[in-house]
């Protein structure tokens, strides 16, 4: 991936996404692409209400808590009540180390997922923490350095910045591919395009 300027990710003989390494890693269009390159946590939830339409920030309710994410554009903004899927890279997960000590933000709301630490593994300078949310979903967090003060069996709050979460599996994600396919199909049946 670090030697390529364009990458095509295929799934069962179909292109999932074509883009630069940065686009593939940081802005995956589908959950398949998000998990194909690197470690990504895939979460599902229901859109509550857009928190701020000016910056495309929305609040999503999961069974383990509320999280905030940014939609890429106004056109990509899901509607309240819509079920959505988000991807969050393992290195972007942060911890509130004790749910008893969590303070709400300026509005008194606490955003994040409540989860129990089930595994803590050191690999050189990296710490890998596996957690299980209250609804049974596994979350993986990767931290560099050994200063993360969480212990196996402890319940913590998993948090991330809205800008670190990506909406995936949106209907618009494959719109260009479908248009291109229709054009190719049209060319093959008509012998080309006409102006």
Model-derived features: where do they sit?
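Hydrophobic Walker B segment
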Residues: 1-4, 36
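Short, glycine/charged-rich "phosphate-handling" switch motifs in NTP-dependent
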Residues: 6, 18, 27
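Catalytic metal- and UDP-sugar-binding loop of GT-A-like glycosyltransferases, i.e.
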Residues: 9-10, 88
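Non-catalytic connector elements of ABC transporters
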Residues: 40, 50-195
């Amino acid at each position: 991936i670090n030697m390529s300027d364009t990458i095509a990710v295929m799934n069962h003989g179909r292109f999932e996404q074509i883009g630069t390494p940065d686009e593939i890693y940081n802005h995956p269009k589908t959950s398949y692409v998000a998990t194909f390159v690197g470690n990504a946590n895939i979460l599902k939830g229901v859109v509550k209400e857009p928190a701020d339409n000016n910056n495309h920030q929305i609040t999503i309710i999961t069974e383990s808590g509320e999280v905030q994410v940014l939609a890429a554009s106004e056109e990509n903004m899901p509607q309240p009540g819509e079920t959505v899927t988000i991807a969050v890279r393992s290195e972007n997960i942060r911890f509130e180390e004790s749910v008893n000590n969590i303070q709400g933000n300026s509005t008194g709301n606490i955003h994040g997922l409540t989860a129990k630490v089930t595994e803590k593994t050191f690999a050189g300078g990296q710490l890998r923490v596996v957690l299980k949310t209250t609804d049974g979903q596994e979350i993986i967090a990767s931290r560099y350095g050994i200063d993360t003060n969480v212990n196996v069996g402890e319940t913590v709050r998993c948090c991330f910045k809205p800008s670190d979460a990506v909406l995936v599996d949106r209907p618009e994600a494959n719109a260009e591919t479908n248009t291109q396919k229709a054009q190719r199909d049209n060319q093959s049946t008509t012998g080309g395009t006409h102006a």
